[in-house]
């Protein structure tokens, strides 16, 4: 099993979200009226996930249906996106060597879908070399790397998942393996802590309601100390979405239920999934992997390399994308990924 969500253009179709309660419906009507009166237009890229209705509902839900607060939040996000040219992130230059070097210090990848159809982001947090990566990229570069990933989720993975399920899929499922977490490399390191604060603030202010759940695996004693600091950056609603799993069989059972089967759980978490190229490659604290990047990482990199002025067909397979991009050999393995047919596994 490997991530097979098709690549989509930010303008590609999605499934519009809808109000879930009469209160939301009433607030949505008032929100639209307020935006019209103030001549606020929601950018098309912000509507990629759930349509314009979905975009508006996320801001309403984040502000507990307070139209005035939701309007202020939305206006701030639109201004922030314009000032920082966020729409161009997926088309801005992506250096191949830098991408591979960063992946070596930050083992993470997308990993199919969970049982609810949400795209899964998987990260071996305990093995990440945060201090080295922040030093290498700087605060701005580290944040930009995160934002590029958020835009990919928001404008590509979530719309694709929605179309696949024919219903709104507007949130992500994160699985983080915090085994061997180093306090020095995270909350005890001033620059890393500063970077984590910046990411938490941006996510809260400009990507509301993007997170469905974060499953925390293999939590060591150091995680308690780290979490006591990190949670201070998060609002109570986001904190509640972090679920620390038990150990051993208890953890495996929880992952199996959440991800939709033991064959969807990576071997390093006790499961039976064997992704072509690995579920998460390049773990610097463990054995080296045969390949540099997972299939999902290669797909992500190729998407960012693509000429975004031309639309990317919904049903492109990795081979088609590789051909269109000059067969980028991101793994240095003669394009093994390009030979794989892009067939989505059943959830």
Where are these regions (language model features)?
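Basic, amphipathic alpha-helical/coil surface patches used to engage anionic, phosphate-bearing ligands
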Residues: 1-347
């Amino acid at each position: 099993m490997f991530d097979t969500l098709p690549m989509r253009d930010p303008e590609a179709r999605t499934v519009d979200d809808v109000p879930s309660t009469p209160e939301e419906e009433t607030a949505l009507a008032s929100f639209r009226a307020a935006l019209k009166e103030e001549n606020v237009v929601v950018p098309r890229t912000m509507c990629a996930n759930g349509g314009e209705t979905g975009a508006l509902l996320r801001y309403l839900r984040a502000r507990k249906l307070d139209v005035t607060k939701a309007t202020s939040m939305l206006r701030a996000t639109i201004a922030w996106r314009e000032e920082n040219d966020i729409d161009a992130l997926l088309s801005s230059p992506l250096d191949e060597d830098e991408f591979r070097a960063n992946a070596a210090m930050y083992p993470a990848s997308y990993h199919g879908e969970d049982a609810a159809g949400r795209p899964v982001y998987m990260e071996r947090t305990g093995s990440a070399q945060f201090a080295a990566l922040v030093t290498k990229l700087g605060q701005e570069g580290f944040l930009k790397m995160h934002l590029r990933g958020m835009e990919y989720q928001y404008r590509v993975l979530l719309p694709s998942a929605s179309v696949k399920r024919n219903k709104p899929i507007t949130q992500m499922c994160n699985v983080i393996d915090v085994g061997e977490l180093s306090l020095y490399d995270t909350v005890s390191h001033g620059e890393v802590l500063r970077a984590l604060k910046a990411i938490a603030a941006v996510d809260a202010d400009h990507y509301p309601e993007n997170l469905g759940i974060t499953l925390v695996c293999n939590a060591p004693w150091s995680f308690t100390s780290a979490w006591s600091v990190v949670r201070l950056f998060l609002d109570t609603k986001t904190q509640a979405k972090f679920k620390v799993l038990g150990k051993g069989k208890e953890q495996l059972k929880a992952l199996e239920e959440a991800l939709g089967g033991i064959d969807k759980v990576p071997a390093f978490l006790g499961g039976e999934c064997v992704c072509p190229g690995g579920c998460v490659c390049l773990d610097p604290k463990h054995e080296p992997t045969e390949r540099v990047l997972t299939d999902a990482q290669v797909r992500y990199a190729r998407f960012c390399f693509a000429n975004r002025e031309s639309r990317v067909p919904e049903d492109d397979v990795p081979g088609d994308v590789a051909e269109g991009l000059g067969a980028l050999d991101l793994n240095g393995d003669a394009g093994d990924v390009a030979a794989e047919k892009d067939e989505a596994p059943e959830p």
